[in-house]
Amino acid sequence: MEQVRISKILSELGLCSRREADKYIEQGLVLLDGKVVDELGTKAYRSQKVELLKKARLNQSLKATVILNKPVSYISHLDDDKEFTPASSLITPDNYYNSQNQETPSKRNPIFNRDGLAPAGRLDIDSSGMLVLTQDGRIAKQIIGEESADIEKEYLVRVEGAITDNDLKLLNHGITLDDYELKPAKVNWQNKDQLNFILIEGRNRQIRKMCELVGLRVNGLKRVRIGNVRLNDLPEGKWRFLSEEESF
């Protein structure tokens, strides 16, 4: 049995991300078999007891994750040139939506410290729908990190044009983009003008390129689900907290 970095053990235990673990080690908030770990890169056996002190656990519990229904014309990431408006600018108390349809409406205060709130994944400027922003490295890891390989992302895509049954089969499995063979997708007609796409990967403008290859023009693209979390009745431009009952 080999030793591994304590930061990796903490991440595997779901207590924090590796980056967060390193910060807690620097602050003296990590214990190994009851003793404070004071050196980055310290290794241990998985059979040893690795834990976070109360202050670190509290800090983790205070980290926010929000679901935003991003409108078209907003970018998902920060723009250093300030040429475009970032979606994070919509995370304001005025845009907060606490749906009464949720089993347990959030008790979190919509006025919260947004430091470190970053998008977990991207959504094109000309696409709308579900965008996750989080302060929690564990959530980011689930959506865009090592654990994201099996996370489904569902989209409603308004298209113009007609395709054959063989074209539809090609969209489901068989397309190569930029010399890369895409993973199988689930693509079905929602109605005569709209396709439903379910992907387990998210390459740059993937859906638009897939549609273009079979002669379809995309007139609108909206993400409605990531993993087990759905956009549901969240209005465009509004946001809510990820509830305690939800997990990706």
Positions of PLM-derived features:
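Basic, flexible Lys/Arg- and Gly-enriched helix-loop patches that mediate nucleic-acid binding at interfaces
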Residues: 2-248
